[in-house]
Amino acid sequence: AIGXQPAAEAEAPFQISLMK
């Protein structure tokens, strides 16, 4: 997910919580 990688799906929950 970091850097808009294609594997963002795996870090979706983490990214959403961080950006929240």
Curated annotation (Swiss-Prot):
It is found in: Secreted. Residues 1-20 form the Peptidase S1 domain. It comes from the Eukaryota. It is an enzyme of class 3 (hydrolase). One of its GO terms (biological process) is proteolysis. The keyword Secreted applies. One of its GO terms (cellular component) is extracellular region. Keywords: Allergen, Hydrolase, Protease, Secreted, Serine protease. The keyword NAD does not apply. Its main location: secreted. Its EC number is 3.4.21.-. GO terms for molecular function: serine-type peptidase activity. Protease that shows specificity similar to chymotrypsin. Belongs to the peptidase S1 family. This is Mite allergen Der p 6. The lineage of its organism: Eukaryota, Metazoa, Ecdysozoa, Arthropoda, Chelicerata.
